[in-house]
Design a protein with these regions (language model features):
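Alpha-helical context
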Residues: 48, 52, 75, 122-126, ...
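Short, glycine-/aromatic-enriched active-site segment of Class I SAM-dependent methyltransferases
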Residues: 76-80
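Short, exposed beta-strand "edge-strand" segments with a Pro/Gly-rich flavor and a Y/T-containing core
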Residues: 60-66, 85-90
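Cysteine-nucleophile active-site neighborhood
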Residues: 1-63, 69-71, 140, 147-158, ...
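Acyltransferase
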Residues: 81-175
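Surface-exposed charge patches
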Residues: 71-74, 97
Length: 175
């Protein structure tokens, strides 16, 4: 079954993967448990100590570099994208290697390498989780590439034809 996690969905996908696949008991987000033994998601480092509600977010449009050969790169058709953000918490890169060893790959990050923006599972036919908000750039007659690909994957899953992202012959036209 296709999975598409957006913002909080990205955060919980990584936490659940850490808990249930990597076996990290107590893996959590500091938004839920500040004393979690495995802080997979934590408050943005640049915002620690900032109490002004409006000043505690990563807000606006930011560039993201996509990993070569990733599901995301195939969907977007490019290796550099620009997406809009609205969040206070981020993925803790200390867990990147452990998650990757079990099958969850970081496939998009900020150009400075500081922020993880996209996680995916290459062994899964369609599993993409993003920290940003693609809905901010989607329109009824011009859907965002991630939504178009997700809907196509759901259609293919229902009809028993879902294999992997990047299958030619898409019924969904983007652009």
């Amino acid at each position: 079954m296709p999975f598409f996690g957006i913002c909080y969905g990205f955060q919980w996908a990584t936490v659940e993967f850490a808990r249930n696949v990597c076996g990290l008991d107590g893996a959590d987000s500091t938004e839920v448990d500040e004393n979690a033994p495995h802080k997979v998601i934590y408050k943005l480092r640049d915002l620690l100590g900032v109490d002004d509600l409006g000043g505690t977010m990563r807000l606006g449009r930011y560039e993201c570099e996509l990993a070569k050969g990733s599901i995301a790169e195939r969907i977007y058709g490019t290796s550099l994208i620009s997406e809009r953000h609205r969040h206070r918490f981020e993925f803790n890169c200390l867990y990147e290697k452990e998650l990757a060893e079990k099958g969850m790959r970081v496939s998009g990050r900020s150009p400075d390498g500081k922020f993880v923006e996209i996680a995916e599972m290459p062994s899964h036919p369609w599993f993409v989780a993003v920290q940003f908000h693609p809905e901010f750039q989607s329109k009824p007659i011009k859907p965002h590439p991630l939504f178009a690909s997700f809907v196509e994957a759901a259609y293919r899953h229902k009809s028993g034809k879902l294999e992997h992202v990047g299958v030619k012959g898409s019924r969904v036209q983007v652009g």
